[in-house]
Amino acid sequence: MLPSYKNYPYLQQLSKECFNISNDDKNYRIDEQVVKIINKAKTIIEEENGLVVKDKIFLNGYSSSGVFAQRFALLHPDIIETAWIGGASGSIPIPTDDFVYPLGIADYESLTGKKFDLESYSNIKFRYYVGEFETQNKSDSRVDDFGHPAPMHDMSYFNRSVPTEVGKYQRMTLGTEMFTRAENTIKILESMGIDISHQIIWARSHNNRSGIGVNELGDRFINDTYNSTIENYNINLGRTR
């Protein structure tokens, strides 16, 4: 949905630099543009198809789009019922002043011009999932805190996604290893009353296109859900394929 341009704010992941984009740029506040698209889609569904849609959405994202979903939930918690996020366990936000955006909310008001809505955020059901072998693929351009190649899909080490010093502080506070960091993050969120779970899917990788990546499971789930939804819709209208 969103492109990634070199030397440009990381739109795909709602990086902090996205808030510095000029308001006359077509990509200004891309998150707010997505909200407008959602509202327009609701209007079309209701007015043109006569269907009733829920006030809040089911937000799904995997890998980069999972990171987008994490941050979109921070920015617009009032419109989300459930956030289903995969392959993004290294950068789970905590709505606290202990961290700055995109891992926390210390600078939230200065970036967005509004106060953080903790009540709405606390009403979101967060469901995280990640493959057991998520950290096995290594980057050829990033190193971890010990000088070794960093896990490719751990955004804590990717400065386009998480600013370098912010990532270092996160790892120092919550853990260098991604699964440990995620576990500690989940415990903090649970202590804050956030409805969150984190499932590790055994014997699965991030995405190697060989049939054992977690994303293949997600694609299958989405396709099956879409097909069953269309089938039920046609049955309710008295249609047959």
Spans of model-derived segments:
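Alpha/beta-hydrolase active-site loop
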Residues: 18-50, 57
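Conserved alpha/beta-hydrolase
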Residues: 1-10
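Short glycine-enriched nucleophile-adjacent loop
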Residues: 66-77
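C-terminal catalytic histidine-bearing segment of alpha/beta-hydrolase fold enzymes
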Residues: 157-169, 176-241
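Short beta-strand immediately N-terminal to the catalytic nucleophile in serine-hydrolase-like folds
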Residues: 59-61, 86
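The feature captures the conserved acid-bearing segment of alpha/beta-hydrolase catalytic domains
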Residues: 82-192
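Surface-exposed acidic, glycine-flexible loop patches that form ligand/cofactor-binding
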Residues: 46-52, 113-120, 188-192, 227, ...
